[in-house]
Amino acid sequence: MLGPLRKEHPIFRILNSTFVDLPLPSNLSIWWNFGSLLGLCLITQILTGLFLAMHYTADISLAFSSASHICRDVNYGWLLRNVHANGASLFFICMYCHIGRGLYYGGSNKIETWNVGVILFLVTVLTAFVGYVLVWGRMSFWAATVIANLVTAVPCVGTTIVQWLWGGFSVDNATLTRFFAFHFLFPFIIAALAIIDLVFLHNSGANNPVGLNSNYDKAPFHIYYTTKDTVGFIALIAALFVLALLFPCALNDPENFIPANPLSHPPHIQPEWYFLFAYAILRSIPNKLGGVIALVAAILVLFLMPLLNTSKNESNSFRPLSQATFWILVATFFVLTWIGSQPVEQPFVLIGQIASLLYFSLFIFGFPLVSSLENKMIFS
């Protein structure tokens, strides 16, 4: 007698084991929704980006005009652009929440899954950066010039890499063309990495809020967690359309509505809001090479989390000192984001330097030392 098609068909069997019969801990909270929300954001970005690419022209004399043409002349082009631009912001909000949940509940202990996730985050950052340049507004142009020029700080090969990246000695037509190619390609790499991340996650099993072994109490993904994820989908789509329809420019830089001009730069050059924390860390180091190293380390430090973990408990749920350390890190992240949006002058420079030092100290010394102290308090 044949079983259900979802269990017999070779393709449906894979989907069934991933989205239907997957056994999960029965006590997962709303913080576990962000993985599926990231998947929804990625699909939305790929679909809207595909339609935008049909009307966009990757040429410095036409890029700004083609972006304007999409909003003015293409049917629902304004909606596509607003959803795509604000979808990127929601993508990063979900990603930061997802990373925060991993840090708080011990997801960083699953080394392969965590490392693939950090690589995914890096590729997403690159995708957003090259996409920001495509509008060819004044802030986009100077962000591409200033941020890419930082690579020249790399000894020996830095200048060569920048010239290859720019396609010449300055940001020009070749730069825009290759950035458009990268921006079109990277989302599919992100999708592939997301599948690899899922494979590792299903191999190691999901953690849970209390950090205990959940093999004795599992629930199937469908219908319990599909329903829960659907609630998250509705909330995310509602938030996206509120932004896209009512406040489409709330998270955009006004300088980007001015066409790019190599002879005129904005009074304060800054990236999009979701990169401001790293930009603040970059600015807090007076040396160019040191700033670039700090900028890269701000993300790469996440790779150290599984190696620096000293706790005997997986989750922070029953560890008040680790909870306090985590929320200090979150507060530091918000302070750095605020500092990144401020001009380079006192007292913002000093606050940025203190927050940057605290950011790295919490990752490298704070969490391991606090976890060791809690081990002694609880288990000795």
Curated annotation (Swiss-Prot):
Binds 2 heme b groups non-covalently. GO terms for biological process: mitochondrial electron transport, ubiquinol to cytochrome c. GO terms for molecular function: metal ion binding; ubiquinol-cytochrome-c reductase activity. It holds the Pfam family Cytochrom_B_C. Coiled coil: none annotated. It is found in: Mitochondrion inner membrane. Heme b b566 binds at residue 98. Its cofactor is heme b. Heme b b562 binds at residues 84, 183. GO terms for cellular component: mitochondrial inner membrane; respiratory chain complex III. Its main location: mitochondrion. Belongs to the cytochrome b family. Heme 1 (or BL or b562) is low-potential and absorbs at about 562 nm, and heme 2 (or BH or b566) is high-potential and absorbs at about 566 nm. This is Cytochrome b. It comes from Paracentrotus lividus (Common sea urchin).
